């Protein structure tokens, strides 16, 4: 879907981006990760030509973006920034309708799209369409920013640290909301971040930047389990093995209670009818599960599906054994 080929950007004698190449498949979320000033945002802005490359090429769906009209290109790509960038003198509805209006959409069609998108980003259209940005919280503004980026149904979205200015509690919730939206709309997303946990949580693939170059490109698990250099290992952190727990979910290691020597009682619908020390959801990542087990002082948890039906038990020993086994395998491969 997106192919970056030998991309460079120089400002006189200063090289901001040097010979960057990678590919992102349709429907993937690719996080451009790295410290400040490493070329992440410059690379992102060369994709929609807010910054013109010194050399190299960007292809979207097989088309060389240098051969496209820059304004038309930008209108065909969703763009979300940390500062949100909503027009303060325009209502939420008018903000969302900016690109559809520029593309000549019928006014009624644009308004229907605005209402539809607010519902997608979990904002009640009857309450928020006529509000102004100053009447919204930071998290609500960010959701409207995402809705605006989706307004013309672009195949590609570029996001420059979109959640960086939001407090940690709301940021985690909005990340979850964005992932839910992405499962629904299936866009190809390039996402700038310096937050390792955010990259691990959200990315299908990660481009780790260092001083204008890509140090390593791969899945979050690749970077955590098999860092390609000392820089990659240091950047991913000394706790990178624990970070891998975010990539695994409770359901994946839930085992039969009887086989684990644990007695539980179920009702006729398969729901728990007895007390258990801890309940976790099938989709909870293993870092959440392990943290909850330690907080509760228990070595196991009951794993439940979205309908509260019992799936099995998650043993703390299985979490640790699974992680250790994967780590040993990763070391042997390297």
Named regions from a protein language model:
Residues 217-218, 226, 313:
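ABC ATPase "signature
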Residues 151-155:
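A short, proline-enriched helix->beta-strand linker immediately N-terminal to the Walker B motif
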Residues 92-101, 111, 115, 204:
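Short helical segment in ABC ATPase nucleotide-binding domains corresponding to the A-loop/adjacent helical element
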Residues 211-212:
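Conserved ABC ATPase "signature" C-loop
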Residues 48:
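Helix-to-loop junction immediately C-terminal to a conserved catalytic motif
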Residues 131-136, 140:
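Conserved ABC ATPase signature
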Residues 108-127:
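Conserved ABC ATPase "signature" region
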